[in-house]
A protein has these predicted regions:
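Single, function-defining residue in the core of a domain
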Residues: 1-59, 65, 74, 78-81, ...
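Primarily marks folded extracellular/lumenal domains of secretory and cell-surface proteins
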Residues: 104-111
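Long, low-complexity, charge-dense
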Residues: 71
């Protein structure tokens, strides 16, 4: 990042955390009416600074961080009364949303004319589950009640080209992951990378209709009609054509990866996609990738290498 870019980011940071803006935000969401020592500006900056500078395990860490930053002696009870307000969550959500939106900039790219250079965004989607205190099981029920009675899931949408999240949503662990996929229209001239938990053929059809692309891990047990079949070395597998996938599954090659052109009927319309299949020697099972990226521009090996980018969202 050069001096000009650093200067621009510094200006944005000062604007996002400016006193008038944060205080107005607190008033707008009805977090506070009268501003005393714990103003929205002071609280927002203290919370951000504390998270950025130390591990945070309890509310007391934020309380100490506030007093240290502003040189105050606010009691724990007074501090707790502010963050316990129902509107505090709205204030924190709005502040975080503005921070992500304003501080995100494009940091990665591709040479013009090369693969993936034509996409406006490369979107990564993921959901991560965390166990929390069992006392919260009624509000945040876990999927695996015997092991994790209470759990939450963090749904994250990330733009790889900006190397930053664009949407972060916290829900009970039982919430359906697919509800947090980007709107199909937002993926025009973009490509979505996601794990198999997000596979929804109706959604993929809408993405394709909107001019979007996807590369998503598929599930075992699918049964589309196989239209074409090629081995990794380019050999056409004529014996696998024009049959349901389940009918040929036992005869799929294991020494080489396979590319199939498959078709489903979705909402009374054909959905034709590329299904890439590889054999995992360690787990003794096939792995599947589903995409609508054109085969001539994006050959099999490139697709597998591109899917590795999805791990970037795991380390956010």
């Amino acid at each position: 990042m050069d001096h000009g870019q650093l200067s621009m980011m510094a200006d944005k940071f000062q604007w996002v955390f400016s006193e008038p803006l944060l205080n107005a935000c607190g008033t707008e969401v009805k977090f506070c009416r009268r501003q005393r020592i714990i103003t929205p500006f002071r609280l927002g900056l203290a919370l951000t600074a504390t998270c950025a500078s130390q591990p945070v395990e309890t509310l007391a860490d934020f309380h100490r961080g506030f007093n240290a930053l502003w040189g105050t002696t606010i009691t724990y009870k007074a501090f707790y009364n502010q963050v316990a307000k129902s509107r505090f969550a709205d204030f924190a959500r709005t502040m975080t949303s503005r921070l992500i939106g304003e501080m995100t900039r494009k940091v990665l790219g591709f040479v013009k004319g090369r693969a993936f250079a034509e996409f406006r965004h490369i979107i990564l989607q993921d959901g991560s589950s965390f166990a929390i205190h069992d006392g919260l099981r009624e509000v945040f029920p876990g999927r695996f009640k015997a092991v994790k009675p209470a759990a939450v899931e963090l749904h994250t949408t990330m733009d790889l080209l900006c190397d930053a999240p664009t949407t972060v949503v916290l829900t009970p662990d039982t919430t359906n992951e697919q509800a947090f996929l980007p709107e199909p229209a937002s993926l025009r001239a973009s490509v979505l990378l996601a794990d198999r938990g997000y596979l929804d053929l109706h959604y993929l059809r809408r993405v394709q209709e909107e001019g979007g692309f996807f590369l998503i891990r598929a599930k075992a047990g699918m049964n589309p009609q196989v239209v074409e079949a090629f081995r990794e070395d380019g050999k056409r597998l004529r014996s696998l054509r024009n049959k349901p996938l389940k009918a040929i599954h036992a005869t799929l090659p294991k020494r080489q990866r396979v590319e199939l052109v498959v078709e489903w009927q979705v909402e009374e319309h054909p959905l034709r996609l590329r299904l890439l299949i590889s054999w995992n020697r360690q787990t003794k099972e096939f792995c599947y990738l589903l995409t609508n990226l054109p085969a001539k521009r994006y050959p099999l090996d490139m697709i597998y290498r591109a899917y590795k980018w999805r791990w970037q969202v795991e380390v956010v």
